Amino acid sequence: MSLNLKLKTIIFVLVSSLLTGCVAAVVTGAAVGMVYDRRGVMTMEADARLFHVIHKNIVTNRQFSDSRIEVTSFNRVVLLVGQTPSASLRVLAEKIAHNAPGVERVYDEVTVGYPIPLTQRTKDSWITGQVRSSMLARKGLESGSVRIVTENGVVYLMGVVTDQQATLAVDVARRVNGVRKVVKIFQYIR
């Protein structure tokens, strides 16, 4: 076996073992999330439907061709984040979300301006991952009951939680490097 082939084999084995760990972490995190998700199956299905309807209506509308709008639905509460070139398009996106059947509330956090660069979106993904990992490790916090959305360094926390869990979730998110602000969009268990 040549040295080059041996080196490739070693690299392949190392990368494969690292990816196996990532897959296990993702699968474990997803399983833990489902166990602690307080929404019923019908609500989860309704959230998926809401996402698809709103997302499709925005993406297929030519007026939004220069916009970047992300849609999140949790417990029939919709969060819109992203950027659009005009205030009128921001209003239109919110109207589309409000008109989707089954929506209880819409939080419109879309800003007027150019879409944020890929580098910032990559940082936002990293921040979301760090917040999620920290929540998994935090005792007293059922991370599956919290949806995390990060946009331009702002972390949005959605979910059905107790007052204590909300406080813990915000504390965890604030401690992550790169977080500029934390916005609570919680529904509280009383």
Model-assigned labels for residue ranges:
Residues 2-6, 13-16, 21-190:
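N-terminal targeting leaders
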